[in-house]
C-alpha cells in the first residue's frame, strides 16, 4: 500500500502514485468490477475508475476512508464507486453478500503512506511519536498496551516470527525489564530498548524491522490475511484475478503457498483419502515469481523496495 511519488495533475492529483500501478493495471486489464480491499489513499482505485471500472473500496481505517471518499466523491455520486468501512478479513460483517463477485480483487498490504506520514498514528519511530500503530478501530490493543502487557515468552516468539530477530529472547527480556520501571508510551521507549540489545550501531533498518513486527501483531495482519485468502478467492468471477502486493516475508509466504495449492491438480485436504475435487485446479498462478518494483521506482521511493506482487486467476 506504499505510494511512490506525487502524480502528475490529471492522473491522481496531488496524491501519490501507488507502487506497481502499471503492473496491477495490466493484470486486471479485463476487469469491469474490482474490489480494492485496501483502499488507503485511493491511488489504485482512482486509476481503475478513470478507465470506467466499477470499484468497491474497503478500508478498516475511518480516516483513510473519509479522505478517499472526498477524493473520489464524483465517482461515488455517479454510482461507479462504493466505499465501505471494513476489515477485508471480515467482509460479511460489513454487509457483503456471498453473491458479491468481482472480476478483480486487489490487496496492497502494509501501511499506507498517509498513515506512515501522520506521526500521531504511531507507525514510525519518530521522536516523541505515540506507540499506537492501529490501522482501524477494530484492533484490541494499541502498540503501547501490547508491549506493556504481553507475556515475555509470547513477546519473544512475536519478535522471532515477525522480525526474524535472532536476539528475540534478550530483547523481550529487556522490554519487560524496562516496562516494570516505566510503561512504554512513545516510540523513543521502544527505540531505546532496541538499542540496549542491538548496540549503539543499530539504526533505522533495525528499528523499522522491530516496529513492523509490533504493528503486525497489533493489527493481527498475518492471521487476517490467512483467513481472508480463501474467502476472497471465492468472490472472484470465472477468470477473475486476485492480485496481492506484500511487504513482509510472512505475507508473501502465505500468498505464495495459497496460490500454489489452488493451482494444484488436486485441492482436497491432505488427510482426505478419496479425491472429491475430480482433479481440477481452482485456477492458475499468473506470477511464477513475485514481481518487484523497478530500480527507477525504488529510486523515487525507497519504501517500494520490499514490495512483492503475486497474482492468481480463477478457473
Swiss-Prot record:
Keywords: Cytoplasm, Methyltransferase, rRNA processing, S-adenosyl-L-methionine, Transferase
InterPro entries in alphabetical order: RsmH, SAM-dep_MeTrfase_MraW_recog, SAM-dependent_MTases_sf
Annotated S-adenosyl-L-methionine binding sites: 42-44, 59, 96, 108, 115
SUPFAM superfamilies linked to this entry: Putative methyltransferase TM0872, insert domain, S-adenosyl-L-methionine-dependent methyltransferases
Protein EC: 2.1.1.199
One BP annotation, GO: rRNA base methylation
Catalytic activity as recorded in UniProt: cytidine(1402) in 16S rRNA + S-adenosyl-L-methionine = N(4)-methylcytidine(1402) in 16S rRNA + S-adenosyl-L-homocysteine + H(+)
Broad enzyme group: transferase
GO MF entries: rRNA (cytosine-N4-)-methyltransferase activity
Keyword Nucleotidyltransferase set for record: no
Major place of residence: cytoplasm
Source organism, top-level taxon: Bacteria
One GO term describing the cellular component: cytoplasm
Keyword Transcription regulation applies: no
Subcellular location(s) of the protein: Cytoplasm
Family according to the record: Belongs to the methyltransferase superfamily. RsmH family.
Function field: Specifically methylates the N4 position of cytidine in position 1402 (C1402) of 16S rRNA.
Annotated protein name in UniProt: Ribosomal RNA small subunit methyltransferase H
Name of the coding gene: rsmH
Amino acid at each position: 500500500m506504499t505510494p511512490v511519488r506525487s502524480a502528475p495533475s490529471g492522473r491522481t492529483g496531488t496524491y501519490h502514485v501507488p507502487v506497481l500501478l502499471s503492473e496491477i493495471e495490466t493484470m486486471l486489464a479485463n476487469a469491469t468490477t474490482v474490489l480494492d480491499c485496501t483502499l488507503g489513499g485511493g491511488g489504485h482505485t482512482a486509476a481503475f475508475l478513470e478507465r470506467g471500472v466499477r470499484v468497491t473500496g474497503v478500508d478498516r481505517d475511518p480516516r483513510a476512508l473519509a479522505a478517499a471518499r472526498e477524493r473520489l466523491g464524483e465517482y461515488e455520486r455517479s454510482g461507479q464507486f462504493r466505499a465501505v468501512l471494513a476489515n477485508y478479513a471480515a467482509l460479511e460483517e460489513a454487509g457483503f453478500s456471498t453473491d458479491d463477485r468481482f472480476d478483480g480483487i486487489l490487496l496492497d498490504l502494509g501501511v499506507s503512506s498517509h498513515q506512515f506520514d501522520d506521526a500521531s498514528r504511531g507507525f514510525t519511530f519518530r521522536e516523541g511519536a505515540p506507540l499506537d500503530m492501529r490501522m482501524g478501530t477494530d484492533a484490541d490493543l494499541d502498540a503501547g498496551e501490547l508491549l506493556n502487557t504481553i507475556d515475555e515468552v509470547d513477546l519473544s516468539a512475536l519478535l522471532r516470527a515477525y522480525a526474524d530477530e535472532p536476539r528475540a529472547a534478550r530483547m523481550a527480556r529487556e522490554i519487560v525489564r524496562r516496562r516494570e520501571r516505566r510503561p512504554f508510551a512513545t516510540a523513543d521507549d521502544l527505540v531505546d530498548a532496541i538499542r540496549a540489545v542491538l548496540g549503539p550501531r543499530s539504526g533505522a533498518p533495525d528499528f523499522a524491522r522491530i516496529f513492523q513486527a509490533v504493528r503486525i501483531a497489533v493489527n493481527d495482519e498475518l492471521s487476517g490475511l490467512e483467513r481472508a485468502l480463501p474467502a476472497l478467492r471465492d468472490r472472484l468471477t470465472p477468470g477473475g484475478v486476485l492480485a496481492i502486493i506484500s511487504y513482509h516475508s510472512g505475507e508473501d509466504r502465505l500468498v505464495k503457498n495459497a496460490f500454489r495449492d489452488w493451482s494444484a491438480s488436486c485441492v482436497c485436504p491432505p488427510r482426505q483419502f478419496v479425491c472429491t475435487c475430480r482433479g481440477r485446479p481452482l485456477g492458475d498462478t499468473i506470477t511464477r515469481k513475485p514481481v518487484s518494483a523497478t530500480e527507477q521506482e525504488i529510486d523515487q521511493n525507497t519504501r517500494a523496495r520490499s514490495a512483492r506482487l503475486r497474482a492468481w486467476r480463477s478457473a
